[in-house]
């Protein structure tokens, strides 16, 4: 994707060539460029034996997932977690814990997963982003994302911490 969309220099319009394994160079103006990442965070918010699950308008299929969103320029990953949860659900969180990351099937995407404890607030969804949001107990989980997704890996790992597994 990156190679196909960076054939010409954005400064002078001349053809770009591979310079290193991860950069391109313009021979005319000597501008060097690297792939840009679109970094997003995703977070499993837990409260006792319950987790916060959402249904976003852009979800394909009838499943519930986790709050996620893009990191803004100049923002830490942890602040992005707090901001996205507050914006989409009205909740506050604490004790944010890194889980892992996964390349995301959005061009140049990287999804970074976290856990966070519920700190306060009532669920009030951002209707432009979400259809529904709510707390679900270990024993009453709805349809959740596919096993290959980082959302599912977060959920499965949380269930293992609780001595359980997903159906």
Segment roles from a protein language model:
Residues 1-6, 17-18, 60-64, 106, ...:
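Nudix hydrolase/Nudix homology domain
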Residues 3, 10, 37-39:
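Short, basic and Ser/Thr-rich N-terminal targeting/leader segments
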Residues 6-13, 26-27:
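Short Cys/His-rich Zn2+-coordinating modules
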Residues 13-16, 33:
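Cys/His-rich microdomains that often coordinate metals
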Residues 20-66, 70, 92-93, 116-118:
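N-terminal strand-loop-strand
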Residues 65-100, 114, 122:
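The catalytic Nudix box helix
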Residues 102-124:
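Active-site-adjacent beta-strand/loop module that shapes the phosphate/pyrophosphate-binding cleft
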